[in-house]
């Protein structure tokens, strides 16, 4: 059985981040469904000062999650580039040499000794726009890879605003393991919701700033004033962001802590499935570059039969929008999108699930990636 390794830097170190856990698990499930031996390699840095979790706790939670998901012993954690959990260093080196493909999410694996052992090393860009800007500024390890994939469906196209420096980025949609995300009844679903971080990375290209999600949310801060539909944001936003918190609450946004409302893999799934629909902006950098980005969180809503209303990143060139998946560019369009979903919720719900089944099913997405990587 052919082996494929999927990497991360968030598996063990961020147990509260259920969405990040699901991100990797969807790739792994898709590979397993296609008959591959799938391994999860997590690169864990030294815990930050004041961390709530000890090293042993983080590894134990990660181990239990892998076992619950059916990975058995197909996992490893490399701590601070030195200590290995889950398998010996020698076994990990041997596995890297045997694997037919490395799926290196966000370039998580940087160890050249391990990288050079792989037959095929695929860099997976999950931050389109930012990645291409940063590649102009410093060594991101792209040269250590021979394959390049991005969730930015417009990357490299004429309307994508950042030069790609000769890299042949191949595009793909975020995969989802549909068997773990059955369509849900809308009987108890009241709120439009989303889950995410308020702040994030910035990048500068030709003296112009490309910013995080907060920049875009503040453009649409008045939306709750234009609808009777409750909108709840499970956002990591620091208590010192007093002006932003006041603006959000003052305009009627409901705010909850994602580490309480949607913590861990099961908590994240429950929160998504108990929502009526998703409403979310995108990071300013995704919008400004016209990246064609679709969130790996959004696909969880779609698979659950939850319609989504998300900010336009140029996605409509590649996916049909208007039923189940709706996009907006202005405050007025966002308000109309909410009205449209609520006016015919059942149809939008069915369309959301259908879109996921037809375009996002993990085996289908991974099969296309593997074929383009030359892996059969």
Which residue stretches match the model-derived regions?
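Short, structured coil segments at secondary-structure junctions
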Residues: 117-118, 144, 165, 251, ...
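Extended catalytic core of nucleotide-activated donor transferases of GT-like folds
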Residues: 6-159, 262-267, 271, 287-289
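Conserved catalytic-core segment of nucleotide-activated headgroup transferases in glycan assembly
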Residues: 156-277, 285
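Catalytic binding pocket for nucleotide-activated donors in carbohydrate/polymer assembly enzymes
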Residues: 14, 19-20, 25-26, 32-47, ...
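Short, polar loop motifs at secondary-structure junctions
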Residues: 106-111, 151-155, 236-242, 311-315
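Extreme N-terminal starter segment of soluble prokaryotic enzymes
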Residues: 1-5
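Hydrophobic anchor at the start of a short beta-strand
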Residues: 36-38, 121, 192, 230-231, ...
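Residues at the C-termini of beta-strands that transition into short coil/loop
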Residues: 79, 125, 152, 173, ...
């Amino acid at each position: 059985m052919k082996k494929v390794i999927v990497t991360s830097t968030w598996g063990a170190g961020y147990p509260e981040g259920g969405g990040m856990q699901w991100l990797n698990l969807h790739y792994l499930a898709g590979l397993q469904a296609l008959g591959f031996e799938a391994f999860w390699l997590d690169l864990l840095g030294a815990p930050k000062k004041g961390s709530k979790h000890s090293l042993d706790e983080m590894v134990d939670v990660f181990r239990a999650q892998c076992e619950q998901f059916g990975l058995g012993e197909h996992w490893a954690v490399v701590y601070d580039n030195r200590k290995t959990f889950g398998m010996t260093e020698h076994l990990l080196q041997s596995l890297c040499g045997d694997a037919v493909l490395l799926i290196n999410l966000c370039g998580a694996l940087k160890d050249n000794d391990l990288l050079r052992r792989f037959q095929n090393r695929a860099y997976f860009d999950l931050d389109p726009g930012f990645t291409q800007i940063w590649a102009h500024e410093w060594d991101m390890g792209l040269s250590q890879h021979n394959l390049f994939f991005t969730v930015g469906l417009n990357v490299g196209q004429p309307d994508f605003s950042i030069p790609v420096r000769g890299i042949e980025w191949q595009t793909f949609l975020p995969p989802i393991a549909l068997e773990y995300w059955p369509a849900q009844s809308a009987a108890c679903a009241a709120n439009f919701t989303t889950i995410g971080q308020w702040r994030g990375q910035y990048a500068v290209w030709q003296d112009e700033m490309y910013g995080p999600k907060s920049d875009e949310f503040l453009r649409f801060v008045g939306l709750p004033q234009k609808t009777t539909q409750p909108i709840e944001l499970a956002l990591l936003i620091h208590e010192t962001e007093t002006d932003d918190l006041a603006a959000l609450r003052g305009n009627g946004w409901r705010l909850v802590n994602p580490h309480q409302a949607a913590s861990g893999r099961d908590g994240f799934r429950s929160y998504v499935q108990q929502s009526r629909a998703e409403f979310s902006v995108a990071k300013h950098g995704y919008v400004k570059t016209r990246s064609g980005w679709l969130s790996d969180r959004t696909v969880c809503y779609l698979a659950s039969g939850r319609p989504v209303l998300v900010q336009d990143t140029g996605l409509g060139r590649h996916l049909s929008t208007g039923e189940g998946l709706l996009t907006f560019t202005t405050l007025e369009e966002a308000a109309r999108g909410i009205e449209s979903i609520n006016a015919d919720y059942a149809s939008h719900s069915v369309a959301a699930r259908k879109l996921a089944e037809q375009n996002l099913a993990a085996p289908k997405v991974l099969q296309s990636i593997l074929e383009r990587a030359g892996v059969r």
